[in-house]
């Protein structure tokens, strides 16, 4: 074996011993680098004759090509080994049982709110929205709640450490009624020309668009037990016009309940009550038709004819505009619809419970 063949064999052995790309590059420098063996051989031809240079140079190039081929081959081997290790590390054991993917769905209370909105929208009601942090005026004063009303106490209402323009702290709205007041103001502003024309018409034939709206949303009160939560949902409704009566309230709410509970035979009663924002006022009860509670009544809503002071605070003349309002708890309707006895179960976040309603 001549010198060049021995050099090629030595290079192949050095490349084979390299276990990483970095080691391979170090081995390459020994043979193909600027100070490598091949470079030294090329420099050694300086003293040779022209014919000897030609012959020697050709032989060295053959050896160089053989070393480069060995280097390329080893690089590919190392790359293949690295890929193989990576594939083994990322391999999937198809014999392992798969992880169950539980499909998500709407919360039962969200389903109830959607159903309420769909039913009232089909009756021509708009759906209002509004802030959950409210001023004292919107939460109480505008709704004919006097300053000494129990609802204003710290024991019943959550207050925020920030005062409004009136110097009274803001509150977490205890009901969604403020949304109705805000909606009424926006409605009157939107149809200002129509309301002005109706007010100027002495014949009474010009009518402004009626206010017909529901206000669903989260509300907050200092209360927590099996049937109450500090955060709960409420949906209030308002219908104001020039010829809206208590009869319309009975028709609308009866139709709603029968549609919601999918029972054309559902019996409702309107029981006299008191609310500062309606006069006259009534509690609305439904009767159980079957089961152990058959024949018994359950309160589902409060209602009444809107108090003149509230109509006035909405920006309308109570001598001309009249209407009704109602308020109900979607959480309680959800409990009734699904037969759940503890309201807190809906808000504990237990997927074992909530998945039953998907």
Curated annotation (Swiss-Prot):
<dbReference type="InterPro" id="IPR006195">
    <property type="entry name" value="aa-tRNA-synth_II"/>
</dbReference>
<keyword id="KW-0963">Cytoplasm</keyword>
<dbReference type="GO" id="GO:0004826">
    <property type="term" value="F:phenylalanine-tRNA ligase activity"/>
</dbReference>
<feature type="binding site">
    <location>
        <position position="279"/>
    </location>
    <ligand>
        <name>Mg(2+)</name>
    </ligand>
</feature>
<dbReference type="GO" id="GO:0005524">
    <property type="term" value="F:ATP binding"/>
</dbReference>
<dbReference type="InterPro" id="IPR045864">
    <property type="entry name" value="aa-tRNA-synth_II/BPL/LPL"/>
</dbReference>
<dbReference type="InterPro" id="IPR002319">
    <property type="entry name" value="Phenylalanyl-tRNA_Synthase"/>
</dbReference>
<dbReference type="InterPro" id="IPR004188">
    <property type="entry name" value="Phe-tRNA_ligase_II_N"/>
</dbReference>
<dbReference type="GO" id="GO:0000049">
    <property type="term" value="F:tRNA binding"/>
</dbReference>
<dbReference type="GO" id="GO:0006432">
    <property type="term" value="P:phenylalanyl-tRNA aminoacylation"/>
</dbReference>
<dbReference type="InterPro" id="IPR022911">
    <property type="entry name" value="Phe_tRNA_ligase_alpha1_bac"/>
</dbReference>
<dbReference type="InterPro" id="IPR004529">
    <property type="entry name" value="Phe-tRNA-synth_IIc_asu"/>
</dbReference>
<comment type="similarity">
    <text>Belongs to the class-II aminoacyl-tRNA synthetase family. Phe-tRNA synthetase alpha subunit type 1 subfamily.</text>
</comment>
<keyword id="KW-0067">ATP-binding</keyword>
<comment type="subunit">
    <text>Tetramer of two alpha and two beta subunits.</text>
</comment>
<keyword id="KW-0547">Nucleotide-binding</keyword>
<keyword id="KW-0479">Metal-binding</keyword>
<dbReference type="GO" id="GO:0005737">
    <property type="term" value="C:cytoplasm"/>
</dbReference>
<dbReference type="GO" id="GO:0000287">
    <property type="term" value="F:magnesium ion binding"/>
</dbReference>
<keyword id="KW-0030">Aminoacyl-tRNA synthetase</keyword>
<dbReference type="InterPro" id="IPR010978">
    <property type="entry name" value="tRNA-bd_arm"/>
</dbReference>
<keyword id="KW-0460">Magnesium</keyword>
<dbReference type="Pfam" id="PF02912">
    <property type="entry name" value="Phe_tRNA-synt_N"/>
</dbReference>
<keyword id="KW-0648">Protein biosynthesis</keyword>
<dbReference type="Pfam" id="PF01409">
    <property type="entry name" value="tRNA-synt_2d"/>
</dbReference>
<keyword id="KW-0436">Ligase</keyword>
<protein>
    <recommendedName>
        <fullName>Phenylalanine--tRNA ligase alpha subunit</fullName>
        <ecNumber>6.1.1.20</ecNumber>
    </recommendedName>
</protein>
